[in-house]
Every structure is written in C-alpha cells, then in structure tokens.
Amino acid sequence: MASCALKQLDAGHVELKTMRVGAAYRGSAAAQQVLEHALAQARAGGAKRISLETGTEAFFTPARRFYQRNGFVPCEPFGSYHPDPNSCFMTLAL
C-alpha cells in the first residue's frame, strides 16, 4: 500500500528519504496519512525541520504539488546533496 523512510541528518533535522503510495491508492487519503505519520515520527524524535529531494521532471509534478500543499517550500541542497538540475529540494519547519 504505502511506505516511507526518514534519515537523521543532525540532531534537529531529518530527511524524508522516500515516500511511496501504491498506484491503487493514489488520489485517496493514503499519501496524506503516510506524510502525517512521517511528520509525527520526526517530531517525536526531536526534529525541528524535515527536508526532501524529489525530481524536477513532469512525472514528479504531482509529488511537488502535494508537498507544497503540505507546507514544504523550496530550499538549497542539504546533507550530502549537491545542486542538480534534476533535483528539487524542499523543507518544512516542524
């Protein structure tokens, strides 16, 4: 159905490393529920910020819009990432 993974970057910063929802569940509340669970886990672990990397290609437009609707804003590369024209970096203060 769905999965996600968080990666600790430092004491107050985590990365939403992956988040996937099965095709049969896209457009349902599943993605929102998974994201809310991930945010709750990040907060419970003491994170003050959560960041993610997604693609810039048209295929990733729905994902970027989803994250924007949930308060994520564009940011600079974080962690071990470097500027990449195929990557979109986003962050959310928790």
Q: What is the meaning of each model-derived region?
A:
Residues 19, 24, 55-57:
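Short strand-loop junctions, especially beta-strand C-caps/beta-turns
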Residues 46-70, 75-94:
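C-terminal "cap" of GNAT-fold acetyltransferases
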Residues 21, 27-44, 65-69:
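Conserved acetyl-CoA-binding loop-helix of GNAT-fold acetyltransferases
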Residues 4, 29, 43-46, 57:
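Residue-level detector of intrinsically disordered, flexible termini
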Residues 1-13, 17, 22, 35-37, ...:
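Acetyl-CoA-dependent GNAT
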